[in-house]
């Protein structure tokens, strides 16, 4: 019967092997302050080696910010002093008003039509007039609210702001007052994002404009 020959671990070869907690090379070359290069074990005082809340082999002090808030709907996370990891990402409750009541919080963001138009087309592009969104009642390539089994479902009159996204191009020269985004890869980009404010006290949910209190 053949047998596998397993070489004994060699401390100092910069390979983490069985029985070693670390291996940073020979003592004169070691650049890892957490590792005892003579034993290939972590120093007894080491609390961590890496992580957003780890510095110089110790847990970062409690209260040090490790993940800044990305919007007014997000919550900044701080180290606990007991772990090398930043706490799980948390955010303000869905439906909380944001951006001076222009929107409502949704999963840490504040989705509004203007920001969606800007993200797709850049500067000088804004939310289109209400008349453009009326096209979403047609239920065709130009305008619809959602897809069911590949079929484009028209919007009810009260849901038109929750279908296809329409933007207004204010660039100099001839421009499109009912500009839409066309994507062969991701038709979700063509649509108003979930959680977007569609009327006072209402947000978009699955192609419907519903009361914010019942949406979440």
UniProtKB/Swiss-Prot annotation:
Co-factor remark: Binds 1 zinc ion per subunit.
Alphabetical list of Gene3D superfamilies matching this protein: 3.40.1620.60, Disintegrin domain
Places the protein is found: Secreted
Enzyme class: hydrolase
Sites where a glycan is attached: 175
Pfam families in UniProt: ADAM_CR, Disintegrin
Metal-binding in keyword set: yes
EC identifiers of the protein: 3.4.24.-
Record's keyword terms, sorted: Calcium, Disulfide bond, Glycoprotein, Hemorrhagic toxin, Hemostasis impairing toxin, Hydrolase, Metal-binding, Metalloprotease, Protease, Secreted, Toxin, Zinc
Tissue specificity annotation: Expressed by the venom gland.
Motif (D/ECD-tripeptide): 72-74
Main location as per UniProt: secreted
Disulphide bonds in the chain: 11-40, 22-35, 24-30, 34-57, 48-54, 53-79, 66-86, 73-105, 98-110, 117-167, 132-178, 145-155, 162-204, 198-209
Domain Disintegrin: 8-94
Annotated GO MF terms: metal ion binding; metallopeptidase activity; toxin activity
Residue sites binding Ca(2+) per the record: 10, 13, 15, 17, 20, 23
GO biological process: blood coagulation; proteolysis
Required cofactor(s): Zn(2+)
One GO CC term on file: plasma membrane
Domain of life: Eukaryota
Family membership: Belongs to the venom metalloproteinase (M12B) family. P-III subfamily. P-IIIa sub-subfamily.
Function: Zinc protease from snake venom that induces hemorrhage.
Record note on quaternary structure: Monomer.
Official protein name in the record: Snake venom metalloproteinase HT-1
Lineage: Eukaryota, Metazoa, Chordata, Craniata, Vertebrata
């Amino acid at each position: 019967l053949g047998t596998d020959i397993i070489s004994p671990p060699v401390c100092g070869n910069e390979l983490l092997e069985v029985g070693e907690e670390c291996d940073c090379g020979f003592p004169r070359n070691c650049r890892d302050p957490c590792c005892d290069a003579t034993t290939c074990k972590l120093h007894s005082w080491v609390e961590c080696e890496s992580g957003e809340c780890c510095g110089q082999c110790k847990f970062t002090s409690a209260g040090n910010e490790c993940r800044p808030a990305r919007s007014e709907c997000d919550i900044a996370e701080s180290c606990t002093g007991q772990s090398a990891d930043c706490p799980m990402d948390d955010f303000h409750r869905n439906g909380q008003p944001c951006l001076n009541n222009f929107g409502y919080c949704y999963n840490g963001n504040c989705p509004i039509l203007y920001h969606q138009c800007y993200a797709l087309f850049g500067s000088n592009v804004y939310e289109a007039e209400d008349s453009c969104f009326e096209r979403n009642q047609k239920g065709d390539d130009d305008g619809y609210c959602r897809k069911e089994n590949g079929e484009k479902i028209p919007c009810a009159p009260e849901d038109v702001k929750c279908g296809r996204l329409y933007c207004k191009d204010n660039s100099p020269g001839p421009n499109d007052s009912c500009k839409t985004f066309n994507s062969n890869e991701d038709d979700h980009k063509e649509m108003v994002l979930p959680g977007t404010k569609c009327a006072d006290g209402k947000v978009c949910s699955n192609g419907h404009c519903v009361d914010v209190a019942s949406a979440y």
